[in-house]
Swiss-Prot record:
Its main location: cytoplasm. A motif (Beta-hairpin) lies at residues 91-114. The gene is uvrB. PANTHER family: UVRABC SYSTEM PROTEIN B. This is UvrABC system protein B. Residues 429-591 form the Helicase C-terminal domain.
Length: 661
């Protein structure tokens, strides 16, 4: 059996060896909750990777959004090139959930665009868990949403070997039960085709490789893997396991039982609605549900099948749904990254989902069993956990209360120390700020300024522009692509000061930033809480000249705690550096990578703008259609490489081109 093998030029330094040893010891001793309190830039991902290598267990890494999950997945793939590092996030590029607005009698049907690549990666993740133990899955919070039964998923998996007695038509029936679709012309993921005694299957978890099964009578003669594009044979296989094409598969017996159970629930609900005089709702529900039942009987599938997941899996009402967590073996470990954000997000998922379903059930769009197609409640989530390590620079009260050990990682490999903090009175703050900005600009350094309101941010930006400072304002309406471009321009020195309200979102750990100015630091609220302040202070921790200025007339409790905690860390870091003769260095590594990524985004944008203006106008309808196909290929390629921002940009260009047809 393959083992986790970490490949890296790094050696653990600073606090890392102690943190790795203590966290590993905690897991081996069976401790359920631990916290890695790691400051910005201390190499938390490397510590996580070393712990995984030490304990050799399947691992789930939970991140609070897709972008962060993609970053982590790329890092873990670099650390573990020989192991299965998988990616599991919501596969919707665009998702409008089903909803009903009673005030205007508006029913909004579920509308979504499923990203084929991400769907493939999800299948790759679940199938890896059944095939091996050296698996790391990096997931967003969408992994606590309902998924089909792992038992049915595994039971329907087909295992084939050369020499096996197996009728070709029997294998075809099995594939159809697993929701594979026969298509002899358009061969794609989740489909199969038949040519005489040769059956070719394109597994749901693959992008470019398919399986060819050759029969001789009732016996499998040969199994080969081939490249779908070139047709070239990659190699012969002694065994192949084909996993279902959907996570919502069920056995024939369970499907029969499910249909009977749906019919019984429908009859009961219709009685209730009619007794309340809700005849329109009753008629609507009957019409919609009967259509779904008919589809299930004929096809084994229907639109919105997830709303019947409780019936399909045979679970009692109100019981927790199956999720990705159920696909893991019992001894798995879990890292919850940026836990101070991720844990509250997990808590909020259930209530938001229930509120939307209330109106759908009340007005006859769905049966009450639709409530059971839902995310886990927080209590159910806790019950499914085995051993967890919370990872954050500012763990929340939940993590601190639950953890049997809190392991600090305060020393950075670069020797950088936390920034010094100065509190300045509000009177004359703008003139003082301008003076500080000019000092930084002379040294070719950058400045972040955080305000509390949009109005304040806009006014400040205008004022700074008027006095000759190169400044930009980043607000919440800016999309990811533009955001990356603004960050790129800041790093390249196209402007010197970035003003924003919430500068805590990912991607703003910039080595060039030597000053963070916090306006209205003494106003109580979530943007000026202890956690937010510490996270904001961390934005200046990647530069050797890092400094934070808080503009305030009084020192609030949150400010005092943030200042004390920063000074405590600073003292430890300075003492360590003096003891080991370390001279702090501004972070250099990674600048080029980030600039490359963002430059290419900008180049793509410029390329498409030029193409659109100069070429598209002169294209025929057929040429535009051909160009759209090329862009779709490029979009899929970018998604495979986890370059979701670039892929989204190409997708937007496709939408614009389709409007011209």
């Amino acid at each position: 059996m393959k083992k986790f093998k970490l490949v890296s030029d790094f050696k653990p330094t600073g606090d890392q060896p102690k943190a790795i040893e203590m966290l590993t010891e905690g897991i081996l001793k069976g401790e359920k909750f631990q916290t890695l309190l790691g400051v910005t830039g201390s190499g938390k991902t490397f510590t996580m990777a070393k712990v995984i290598e030490n304990v050799q267990r399947p691992t789930l890494v939970l991140a609070h959004n897709k972008t962060l999950a993609a970053q982590l997945c790329s890092e873990f793939r670099e650390f573990f090139p020989e192991n299965a590092v998988e990616f599991f996030v919501s596969y919707y590029d665009y998702y409008q959930p089903e909803a009903y607005i009673p005030e205007t009698d508006t029913y909004i049907e579920k509308d979504s665009s499923i990203n084929e690549e991400i769907d493939k990666l999800r299948h790759s993740a679940t199938s890896a868990l059944f095939e091996r133990r050296d698996v790391i899955i990096v997931a967003s919070v969408s992994c606590i949403y309902s998924l089909g039964s792992p038992e049915d998923y595994l039971n329907l998996t087909i295992s084939l070997r050369p020499g096996m007695t197996k009728d070709r038509d029997e294998v075809i029936r099995d594939l159809i039960r697993m929701q594979y679709e026969r298509n002899d012309i358009d061969f794609r993921r989740g489909r199969f085709r038949v040519r005489g005694d040769v059956l070719e299957v394109f597994p749901a978890s693959n992008t470019d490789r398919a399986i060819r099964i050759e029969f001789f009578g009732d016996e499998i003669e040969r199994i080969t893997e081939f490249d779908v594009v070139t047709g070239e044979v990659i190699g012969r296989r002694n065994h192949v396991a084909i996993f279902p094409a959907s996570h919502y598969v069920t056995t024939a017996e369970k499907l029969k039982r499910a249909i009977k159970s749906i019919e019984e629930e429908l009859e009961q609900r219709l009685k209730e609605l009619r007794s309340m005089g809700k005849l329109v709702e009753a008629q609507r529900l009957e019409q919609r549900t009967r259509y779904d039942i008919e589809m299930l009987q004929e096809m084994g599938f229907c639109k919105g099948i997830e709303n019947y997941s409780r019936h399909l899996t045979g679970r009692p009402p109100g019981s927790p749904p199956y999720t990705l967590l159920d696909y893991f073996p019992n001894d798995f470990i879990m890292f919850i990254d940026e836990s101070h954000v991720t844990i509250p997000q997990v808590r909020a998922m259930y209530n938001g989902d229930k509120a939307r379903k209330d109106t759908l059930v009340e007005y006859g769009f769905r049966l009450p069993s639709a409530y059971d197609n839902r995310p886990l409640t927080f209590e159910e989530f806790e019950e499914k956990l085995n051993q967890v390590i919370f990872v954050s620079a500012t763990p929340g009260p939940y993590e601190l209360k639950k953890s049997s050990r809190i392991v600090e990682q305060i020393i950075r490999p670069t020797g950088l120390v936390d920034p010094e903090i100065e509190v300045h009175p509000v009177q004359g703050q703008i003139d003082h700020l301008i003076g500080e900005i000019r000092k930084r600009v002379e040294k070719n350094q950058r400045v972040l300024v955080t305000t509390l309101t949009k109005k304040m941010a806009e006014s400040l930006t205008e004022y700074l522009k008027d006095v000759g400072i190169r400044v930009r304002y980043m607000h919440s309406d800016i999309d990811t692509i533009e955001r990356m471009q603004i960050i790129r321009d800041l790093r390249l020195g196209k402007f010197d000061v970035l003003v924003g309200i919430n500068l805590l979102r990912e991607g703003l750990d910039l080595p060039e930033v030597s000053l963070v100015a916090i306006l209205d630091a003494d106003k109580e609220g979530f943007l000026r809480s202890e956690t937010s302040l510490i996270q904001t202070i961390g934005r200046a921790a990647r530069n050797v000249d890092g400094k934070v200025i808080m503009y305030a007339d009084r020192i609030t409790n949150a400010m005092q705690k943030a200042i004390d905690e920063t000074n405590r860390r600073r003292k430890i870091q300075i003492e360590y550096n003096q003891k080991h003769g370390i001279v702090p260095q501004t972070v250099r590594k990674g600048i080029r990578q980030i600039i490359e990524a963002t430059v290419s985004v900008a180049e793509e944008e410029e390329k498409y703008e030029v193409v659109e203006k100069e070429i598209v106008e002169n294209m025929t309808k057929e040429e535009i259609e051909e160009y759209i196909k090329e862009l779709e290929q490029e979009m899929k390629k970018l998604a495979i490489e986890l370059e979701f921002e670039k892929a989204a940009k190409v997708r937007d260009k496709i939408f614009e081109l389709k409007k011209l047809l």
